[in-house]
Design a protein with these regions (language model features):
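Conserved ABC ATPase signature
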Residues: 149-154, 158
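Conserved structural motif at the start of ABC-family nucleotide-binding domains
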Residues: 6-8, 23, 86
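ABC ATPase NBD coupling module
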Residues: 75-92, 110, 118, 124, ...
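Conserved ABC transporter NBD signature motif
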Residues: 62-74
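Conserved ABC ATPase "signature" region
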Residues: 73-74, 125-145, 254-255
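Short catalytic/signature loops enriched in Gly
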Residues: 4, 141-145, 235-328
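P-loop NTP-binding/switch modules centered on Walker-like glycine-rich loops
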Residues: 41, 55, 171-172, 176-180, ...
Length: 328
């Protein structure tokens, strides 16, 4: 097997003055050509994780890890100049809000060319040709004319295609896609997902996909890590977790998904709400909402244990099949 593109071991993020870490004990590996989805509801720490890896958090953030290795280099320990060299080159990001991610004062072509010139060098004409190639690759119609367009002259879907072109312009080893379809309508979402998947297959890039949408996960991801209140509660191959979720939170997420077929009742909901940093419990952070909770769950965080090859779950009641008929 090829060496992993990214190895993260025990990543934690805490902001100055905060009573608890917003990300705690996060560990995962991303292999070449594979897609890992970080899944969870708003505020679970998905985007903070991505910004920590990119080095884009404010100075008030304290980021620690036993290991955060990108292609053999220490992401957290490297000089800022080296990190700037990696960002936009071997390590790229597609942000979730295409309407505000591009600079309104510069044309699309100027912004694409800047990315190429910053990391590849070469002439203006070569950079312009590369920018044109990338717009054509992401299927922007009338690509030559679009080079001279300003962001406000493009639709949201077109802007997101430009963001994808910019991320892929220098053939990155890893793409971090933070909710890349959130601001788009359903039809455009499907087109963007298909585009990302085809370009990833073409380039062999690895990807971290950040999303709350399990439908998106099923469409494009190979592995998934389910996050709740800053911690991973379950991880494993996508097909395995969809077929046999073993954490009560994962089970609740699956139960809340709408289906195309006939429904006999209401969609499932998860009672309660995510604890704020002030309310973080000593034990399992899902305990206050869990129908299977034990007294021991409130004492200490349950460790991630392997239930099946590749599938890990942080739950004292796993496997849940033993308790589905008799919740506590």
């Amino acid at each position: 097997m090829s060496a992993p593109v990214l190895v993260v071991d025990d990543l934690s993020v805490r902001f100055a003055g905060a009573p608890a870490a917003v990300v705690e004990g996060l560990s995962f590996t991303v292999q070449p050509g594979r897609t890992l989805a970080l899944v969870g509801e708003s505020g679970c720490g998905k985007s903070v994780t991505s910004m920590a890896l990119m080095g884009l958090l404010p100075a008030t953030a304290e980021v620690r890890a036993h290991q955060a290795s990108f292609m053999g280099e220490d992401l957290l320990g490297m000089p800022e100049a080296r990190r700037r060299d990696l960002r936009g080159d071997r390590l790229a990001m597609v942000f979730q809000e295409p309407m505000t991610s591009l600079n309104p004062a510069f044309t699309v072509g100027e912004q694409l060319m800047e990315t190429v010139l910053r990391h590849r060098g070469g002439s203006q004409s070569a950079a312009r040709q590369r920018a044109l190639e990338m717009l054509e690759k992401v299927r922007v119609p009338a690509a030559t004319q679009r080079l001279a367009a300003y962001p406000h002259e493009l639709s949201g879907g077109m802007r997101q295609r430009v963001m994808i072109a910019m991320a892929l312009a220098n053939d990155p080893a890893l793409i971090i896609a933070d909710e890349p379809t959130t601001a788009l309508d359903v039809t455009i979402q499907a087109q963007i997902l298909e585009l990302i998947a085809s370009l990833q297959a073409e380039t062999g890039s690895a990807m971290i996909l950040i999303t709350h949408d399990l439908g998106v996960v099923a469409e494009v991801a190979d592995e998934m890590a389910v996050m709740y209140a800053g911690r991973v509660v379950e991880s494993g191959p996508v097909a395995q977790l969809f077929d046999d979720p073993q954490h009560p939170y994962t089970l609740g997420l699956m139960g809340s998904m709408p289906s195309l077929g006939p429904r006999t009742g209401r969609l499932a909901t998860i009672a309660g709400r995510v604890p704020t940093p002030v309310e973080m419990p000593a034990g399992c952070r899902f305990a206050s909402r869990c129908p299977f909770v034990l007294d021991a769950c409130r004492v200490a965080p349950p460790p991630l244990v392997e239930l099946a090859p590749g599938q890990q779950v942080a739950c004292l009641r796993a496997p849940l099949e033993q308790h589905l008929e008799t919740p506590a």
